[in-house]
């Protein structure tokens, strides 16, 4: 599954607060293994293919690639061509005023980013943010949809569920849930910068293609600082604290709130049930 999303820029350098347009792979049919789409303020005459209408505040494009098996999948190669630049050269404006404005926007972007990251990893005393997201450790907040309004770069068709882990060397966090019908779901362990804790030597996430379900259709995920024997086990690579995130795309129903239990490593499940 892949997509192309256009976000706005409400002020120079500010994080987006609106999704301008979004196209998924299913919106862009393949012809001889290739697809195309167009972006612009007005749909070109005679063109009836995939199109995103750009608003005056449209600013950035983000592409995404999701694979059930990344080792077997192929990433999308994107070719970008300027068809019409309002009669102007498709070249950056390197005048003093333009460069100064770009530097001011970069400073605003850095300030907005550093106001968020590094994120709070966990709180020993349970707390809740205004949007309902939990700061308690070893729990996940209720799943939520973002819709077209956003702060940052979330996906309007996705459901998110976020939380934090804090584990001792002899502890394991066991997550249980039943997923709704959806095109794709995944679960990822993050550091405080919303990046995978490490991917060079072992996986930091699991998805609908790699997870082994229980006999009743539910999914159990076992997290510990070491890699345990469960087929859906994830290691924090000995990180004592971090973040965790579920995503569901095109979920038929709102996912249930995942349950979490902290057990000793010796008591953690080793097999699916």
Go through each PLM region and give its residues:
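A compositional/structural signature for long, glycine/proline-rich flexible linkers
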Residues: 1-273
């Amino acid at each position: 599954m892949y997509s192309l999303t256009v976000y706005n820029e409400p002020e120079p350098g500010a994080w987006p607060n609106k999704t301008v347009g979004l196209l998924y792979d299913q919106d862009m049919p393949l012809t001889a293994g290739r697809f195309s789409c167009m972006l612009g303020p007005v749909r070109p005459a005679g063109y009836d293919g995939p199109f995103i209408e750009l608003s005056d505040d449209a600013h950035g494009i983000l592409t995404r690639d999701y694979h059930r098996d990344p080792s077997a999948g192929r990433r999308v190669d994107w070719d970008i061509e300027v068809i019409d630049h309002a009669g102007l050269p498709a070249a950056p404006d390197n005048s003093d005023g333009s460069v100064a404005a770009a530097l001011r926007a970069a400073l605003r972007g850095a300030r907005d980013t550093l106001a968020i990251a590094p994120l709070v990893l966990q709180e020993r005393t349970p707390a809740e943010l205004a949007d309902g997201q939990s700061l308690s450790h070893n729990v996940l907040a209720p799943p939520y949809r973002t819709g077209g309004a956003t702060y940052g770069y979330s996906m309007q068709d996705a459901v998110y569920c976020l939380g934090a882990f804090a584990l001792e060397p002899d502890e394991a966090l066991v997550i249980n849930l039943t997923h709704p019908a959806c095109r794709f779901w995944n679960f990822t362990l993050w550091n405080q910068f919303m990046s995978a804790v490490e991917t060079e030597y072992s996986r930091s996430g699991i998805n609908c293609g790699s997870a082994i379900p229980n006999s009743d259709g539910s999914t159990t995920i076992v997290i510990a600082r070491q890699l345990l024997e469960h087929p859906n086990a994830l290691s924090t690579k000995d990180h004592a604290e971090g973040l965790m995130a579920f995503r569901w795309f095109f979920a038929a129903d709102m996912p249930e709130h995942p349950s979490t239990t902290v057990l000793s490593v010796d008591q953690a499940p080793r097999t699916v049930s």
